[in-house]
């Protein structure tokens, strides 16, 4: 008997050190806004507003907490000594880029937090989580330990949930989490097909690979995740992302494709072997025909797709079809805006488009899809999670007040060395773990 299930979205709450340091080579938006003055308060409120709109529509909306930044334990591991004030002064003087890296609020993009396999797909019928090692970027490679603690604090019942450590943090097993993973199915509670998208084959130097920008996800990492999660060949498809797309600024597959249910919405340049990918999915998809919504380069040039983040949108079930939740930038790019008007009139599962303002995140290269981790849960599993992280009207009001009390409305690169900022962050996070009922998850709390 198939159990009823929902796809819950767990959005990253933007952290108090949200800034524009331009740390992500291959992420065009991140590099183009380097050294701009950020507004952490506005960023967090924009993220909360997006969550609230979706929760108000009846979607299960959860929250993943920000991380402690600047991260003093990492600076100590890099040889900076003394008390915390002295450490911040020393790193700001010696190498401001390192300070920017350990101060990044990049954990807000929870599509990179982990890969999640629903219980309907796994051998032991538990929901499996593997935090992404994010080894391609130093500032993100320090996230997975706290991410793992957060996930265990939320999904703690071992009879329903299985947690794995991140893969070895080396380039051969570079893993970027759910940003390179999507699941297709007839219904959420039915066994589905998990699409793992990789950029290169690490142990085969002759295999196709991008030339300008690095491929962050390897086939070896994707296969390892599938093994850890107990997925059979019937539940997994491995597809290579088009190297030309990576070189055009598509640093994760969720910048060029998004799936939901039996619908795959993608650009024609997304996959290296498009026909084989679609055939492999359809062969494994039970109970439904694959609805492939293909966007041609004539309709939307890949440069416009990257500039607008058309595909970094959330694709959500509605009563009469699917809703595409797009960033506001989609209405600022003519080809994309025109395409969206045509899309809702066409014969596809996508029947509605709604615009969301996540501009503070977009300037660092993260749209609506980057900000959320999808977790399919049946009714028993949903009942077993820590309900303190599920957004309600009361929690929204409390978190809004919390942000307004603790977040600055301006943050520049020079501010990262301010020892008061670290104190402000810790005070805020200590209060947040109480609000969400997470217990002690941060290094300063342990």
Swiss-Prot record:
Recorded catalytic activity of this chain's protein: N(2)-succinyl-L-arginine + 2 H2O + 2 H(+) = N(2)-succinyl-L-ornithine + 2 NH4(+) + CO2
Pfam families per UniProt: AstB
Enzyme Commission number(s) from the entry: 3.5.3.23
UniProt-listed Gene3D superfamilies: Succinylarginine dihydrolase
Binding site for substrate: 21-30, 112, 139-140, 216, 254, 364
InterPro entries: AstB_sf, SuccinylArg_d-Hdrlase_AstB
Family classification: Belongs to the succinylarginine dihydrolase family.
Reported function: Catalyzes the hydrolysis of N(2)-succinylarginine into N(2)-succinylornithine, ammonia and CO(2).
Protein name as it appears in the record: N-succinylarginine dihydrolase
Protein source organism: Marinobacter nauticus (strain ATCC 700491 / DSM 11845 / VT8)
Organism phylogeny: Bacteria, Pseudomonadati, Pseudomonadota, Gammaproteobacteria, Pseudomonadales
Name of the encoding gene: astB
């Amino acid at each position: 008997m198939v159990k009823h299930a929902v796809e819950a979205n767990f959005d990253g709450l933007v952290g108090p050190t949200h800034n524009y340091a331009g740390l992500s080579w291959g992420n065009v938006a991140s590099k183009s806004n380097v050294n701009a003055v950020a507004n952490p308060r506005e960023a967090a409120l924009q993220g909360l507003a997006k969550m609230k709109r979706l929760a108000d529509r009846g979607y299960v909306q959860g929250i993943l907490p920000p991380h402690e930044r600047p991260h003093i334990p990492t600076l100590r591991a890099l040889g900076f000594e003394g008390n915390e004030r002295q450490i911040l002064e020393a790193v700001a003087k010696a190498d401001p880029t390192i300070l920017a890296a350990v101060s990044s609020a990049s954990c807000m993009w929870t599509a990179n937090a982990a890969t999640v396999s629903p219980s309907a797909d796994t051998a032991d019928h538990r929901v499996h989580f593997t935090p992404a090692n994010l080894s391609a970027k130093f500032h993100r490679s320090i996230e997975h330990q706290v991410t793992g603690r957060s996930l265990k604090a939320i999904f703690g019942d071992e009879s329903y949930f299985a947690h794995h450590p991140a893969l070895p943090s080396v380039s051969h097993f570079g893993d970027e989490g759910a940003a390179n993973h999507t699941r297709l199915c007839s219904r959420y509670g039915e066994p589905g097909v998990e699409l793992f998208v990789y950029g290169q084959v690490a142990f085969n130097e002759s295999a196709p690979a991008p030339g300008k920008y690095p491929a962050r996800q390897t086939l070896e990492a994707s296969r390892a995740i599938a093994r850890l999660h107990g997925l059979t060949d019937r539940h997994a498809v491995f597809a290579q992302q088009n190297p030309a797309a990576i070189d055009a600024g598509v640093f994760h597959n969720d910048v060029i494709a998004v799936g939901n249910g039996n619908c795959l919405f993608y650009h024609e340049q997304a996959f290296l072997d498009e026909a084989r990918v679609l055939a492999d999915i359809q062969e494994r998809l039970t109970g439904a025909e694959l609805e492939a919504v293909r966007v041609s380069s004539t309709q939307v040039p890949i440069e416009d797709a990257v500039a607008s983040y058309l595909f970094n949108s959330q694709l959500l079930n509605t009563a009469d079809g699917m809703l595409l939740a797009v960033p506001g930038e989609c209405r600022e790019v003519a080809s994309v805006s025109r395409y969206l008007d045509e899309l809702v009139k066409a014969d596809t599962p996508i029947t509605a488009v709604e615009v969301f303002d996540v501009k503070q995140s977009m300037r660092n290269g993260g749209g609506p899809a980057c900000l959320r981790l999808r977790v399919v849960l049946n009714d028993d599993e949903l009942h077993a999670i820590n309900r303190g992280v599920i957004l309600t009207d009361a929690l929204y009001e409390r978190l809004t007040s919390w942000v307004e009390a603790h977040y600055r409305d301006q943050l520049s690169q020079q501010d990262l060395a301010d020892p008061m900022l670290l104190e402000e962050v810790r005070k805020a996070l200590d209060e947040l773990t109480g609000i969400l009922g997470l217990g002690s998850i941060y290094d300063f709390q342990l």
